Amino acid sequence: MTTPQLPLQDQLRGFSRALFSTWIYHRRFNILFDAGEGVATALFNRVFGIRRIFLSHGHADHIAGLVNLINIRNLGAGDQTASLKIYFPKNNRLIDLLREYLSRTQNGLSFDLEWIGVDENEQVWLEDQKSRIFIRTFRTKHSNKQLSLGYNVIEIRRRLKDKYHGLGQKQLNEIIWAYGKDEIAEDIEKIIFSYGGDSRPIDPDSVRQSMFLCHECTYLSIEDDERNFQQHSHLEEVLEIAAQADVETLLLFHSSLRYSLEVLKEQICLGMQKIKAKFRVLVLYGDHIIDPLAEDFPKNSRKKTREKEFEQVIVEGDQ
């Protein structure tokens, strides 16, 4: 069994605000999930460590950052020879247009760039990982005009077969000596990370018992979807999905700009109390992963940050 050296949330870098940009970088696996605007600017030379990119769909706020990322990988001061694979929902017209643009403006790349179209329920093995780890795609519901996908990071683990539970180590050793290790142990698939992209509520069976589910939460209530596009999720249904799927940690992202951090905290607390949630909830608010239930939750932190930025602009302007 592979135990992460850091808590899962500490292995992530990301940014997400509805309409503007969404991306999440998983440092343990060198994987980028979606590539919204600003990803290369935020990661700087860390972009050279990315080995695979998994795109959930082709909307601009999830793919616009690819242009600069590929340019920096080609010209920046890093390993310009490391290959990059980009997985995307197959037959996506918007992504095909971006690929055409990049082929015209970024010809003669210094590294191998491979675009791989995938469908639902496909597997991608991560050969560069020491453990037996692979990605499995699952279908999401976002746009009627294009296929959208979510991604599970799955680790193959070994466990004791049920019929041998309760036996002592001496008895187990005797069975191993007589029949081999495979007699007492079996492989199981464990979802250690799930990313859903933009989506209506994900099917709980697709992410069942995930250790860490990233699920969009654009709205706090269904009434806030004034245009009734029905392409996104609201808080109550996301919490219910996480409970039904029996996940360990839920990371909410893609929140609307209308909500302050304090409002998100209040509504998340109420929502979790309502369903008596047993899982942990985190929020990717801009570029910060925050625990809204923590006692040291930074009240008015966003307001104070903006005030400091404004004061800095005034000082620099006076100079």
Predicted feature residues:
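Conserved beta-strand hairpin/beta-sheet module of binuclear metal-dependent hydrolase folds
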Residues: 1-46, 52, 149-153, 159-160, ...
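Active-site metal-binding motif and surrounding structural segment of the metallo-beta-lactamase
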Residues: 39-87
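Metal-dependent catalytic neighborhoods of phosphoester/phosphodiester hydrolases
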Residues: 65-73, 98-103, 260-269
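Alpha-helix termini
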Residues: 72-80, 105-106, 160, 183-185, ...
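Active-site neighborhood of divalent metal-dependent phosphoester bond hydrolases
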Residues: 79-82, 92-119, 258
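Cap/insert and terminal regions of metallo-dependent hydrolase folds
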Residues: 85-86, 93-94, 177-291
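Short, surface-exposed amphipathic charged segments that create phosphate/polyanion-binding patches used
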Residues: 124-137, 152, 291-306
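Active-site-proximal loop/helix segment associated with metal-binding centers of metalloenzymes
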Residues: 127-208, 212-214
